[in-house]
Amino acid sequence: MTRLQGRGSGPRPKWGTYCLRSVDDGRTWKSHAVIAQDDANQPLNGYCEPSVEVMPDGSLLAALRTEGGMEADQKTGVLYLAQSCDGGLTWSTPRAVNPFGVFPQLLRLDNNIVVLAFGRPGVNLLFNVDGRGERWQGLTLLVNEGQRFTHTSGYTSLVATGADRFLIAYDQFDYPDADGEPRKTILVREVVVR
């Protein structure tokens, strides 16, 4: 199974998020389910940039961003979570987990702690220890407070490196090189979660 995003139709189409499923090792894919789409109550441009992770109980958790609006103060929308307890056939109504965020990334470690990384502003981490994705704690900002609005795209990548640790990669627009000149740089940090 994989996830994707797409736009609806009509005069003001909004983003939606969907699951595709393959039963032939990825040679062909078919529509499996809608995670979230074109909610009439969603004030921005819909749900996009989905990330899906298998939770310790076997359920699926999806993290979704909402597309930012066109107003100057709407640079990013709310970050949402949705859950499936039937292999991704049906999904709960998305619920807000953070008032902002782009490109959410979920990662379950072998110690069953689930990491949620997201950005804009900044690069942020949240941690779930209940195994169900209900309670999140430990909001951590990985860039300097004064740089969180202008010095990173906020897009990240996560990879587990052990039962209680992972690498996070993210960009910084003006990281000083060996001569002190600001350069766009990809940074990687190891994080240990116990």
Role assignments for model-derived ranges:
Residues 1-194:
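Asp-box/BNR beta-propeller blade signature and adjacent active/binding-site loops
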